[in-house]
From Swiss-Prot:
Keywords, alphabetical: ATP-binding, Ligase, Nucleotide-binding
EC number: 6.3.2.2
Official protein name in the record: Putative glutamate--cysteine ligase 2-1
Listed Pfam families: GCS2
Task performed by this protein: ATP-dependent carboxylate-amine ligase which exhibits weak glutamate--cysteine ligase activity.
Taxonomic classification: Bacteria, Bacillati, Actinomycetota, Actinomycetes, Kitasatosporales
Coiled coil: none
Family: Belongs to the glutamate--cysteine ligase type 2 family. YbdK subfamily.
Organism: Streptomyces avermitilis (strain ATCC 31267 / DSM 46492 / JCM 5070 / NBRC 14893 / NCIMB 12804 / NRRL 8165 / MA-4680)
Presence of keyword Ligase: yes
Record InterPro entries: GCL_type2/YbdK_subfam (IPR050141), GCS2 (IPR006336), Gln_synth/guanido_kin_cat_dom (IPR014746), YbdK (IPR011793)
One annotated GO biological process: modified amino acid biosynthetic process
Gene3D superfamilies: 3.30.590.20
Length: 362
């Protein structure tokens, strides 16, 4: 059974006003007072963000429970530092991001200017174990067209600087400003993958292989494929669903590779259009079907994803969990829909944020 780990980035906000607060250093200090050897929480690009990482899990119920536990611990440490945590992929309220300055981030600030300054976005990264780089590259090649569906399911960033962006996942559009971000062409072999990464680093435009921000990549730290397209999800059960589907995609792709089935050869241009459509429409409109690359009702494309990974989900014991979670998500709506409904009901972005703080805990 493949292990799965999740990394989530959370927004630190004022519990009264909902405005982001640059208190990550204070929050981490509280976490380290409790456990000097803690390795769960760490700083991110901006001081208004906090990241946590789960341990690798094979059981999805255990992974979901750990996500909830980490969020609650983050909330406790944040409360002691004078702020709250919100699983929001962008700040609904206007904010001037505060870059957490170390040598790496200083280099990035000088290199990328306003694109770096405005990159106050919170994502969810899923690591799924692979047996080798050869299997990993085969997986990366085969999951490419399905990743926009994860964008739509996780979409949780409708607001930007106090305005409705008209997108369901505006975070993914902001993230796309990085020069190395986005979908990839077919690699075909680990040699070609590693050669491309080395060539990208050699340009000097990016600092190292950690800044190769492919939608899915071989992790440079773990024996995993890292899927990097999702917004941080408002509700923990949605994060668990994204991880479940990610493992299903990886396992299905590995099986296709071993069976000699070739990957879809969609161009990067088409994949970018699919990603844009998913960010714009989320679950409320139409998506591009991963095989035909033609518009289809979002629910139908989500059902196609479930069918595509169905055997892998069943073999892992995750089929019922995935179907139930998808049904609930389609009924309730993704985070973007929830945020917009909160604003419509309360008339206040501040109240929207404070309610999202509550819902972050599950």
């Amino acid at each position: 059974m493949r292990t799965v780990g999740v990394e989530e980035e959370l927004l630190l906000v004022d519990p009264e006003t909902g405005e982001p607060k640059a208190l990550s250093t204070a929050v981490l200090a509280r976490a380290e007072q409790v456990d000097p050897d803690q390795d769960v929480f760490e700083k991110e690009l901006h001081g208004q963000m906090l990241e946590f990482a789960t341990h690798p899990q094979t059981d999805m119920a255990a992974l979901g429970a750990e996500i909830v536990r980490c969020r609650k611990e983050a909330a406790r440490h944040a409360g002691e530092a004078g702020c709250a945590v919100a699983a929001l992929a962008t700040s609904p309220l206007p904010v001037s991001p505060s870059i957490a300055m170390n040598r790496r981030y200083q280099w990035m600030a000088e290199q990328y200017g306003i694109a770096m300054q405005e990159q106050l976005t919170c994502g969810c990264h899923v690591h799924v174990a692979v047996e080798s780089d050869e299997e990993g590259v085969a997986v990366v090649d085969r999951i490419r067209p399905w990743l926009p569906v994860l964008v739509a399911l996780s979409a949780n960033s409708p607001f930007w600087q106090g305005r409705d962006s008209s997108y369901e996942s505006y975070r993914s559009r902001v993230w796309g400003r990085w020069p190395s971000a986005g979908p990839t062409e077919l690699f075909g072999s680990p040699e070609r993958y590693h050669r491309q990464v080395a060539d990208m680093v050699a340009t000097g435009v990016i600092l190292d292989d950690g800044m190769v921000y492919f939608d899915a990549r071989l992790s440079h730290r773990y024996p995993t494929v890292e899927i990097r397209v999702a917004d941080v999800c408002l509700h923990p059960d949605t994060a668990q669903l994204i991880a479940t589907l990610a493992r299903g995609l990886v396992e299905s792709a590995a099986r296709d590779w071993r069976a000699g089935r070739e990957p879809e050869d969609h161009s990067v241009s088409l994949l970018r259009l699919a990603a844009w459509q998913a960010a714009r429409a989320g679950l409320s409109g139409e998506l591009l079907h991963p095989v035909t690359m033609r518009r289809l009702r979002a629910e139908s494309v989500v059902r196609a994803l479930l069918e595509h990974v169905g055997d892998a989900l069943a073999d892992a014991g995750d089929l019922d969990l995935a179907h139930e979670a998808v049904a609930e998500l389609l009924e309730r709506g993704n985070g973007a829909r929830v945020q917009r409904e909160l604003l419509e009901r309360t008339g206040s972005l501040r109240d929207t944020v404070t309610e999202c703080v509550r819902q972050t805990q599950g």
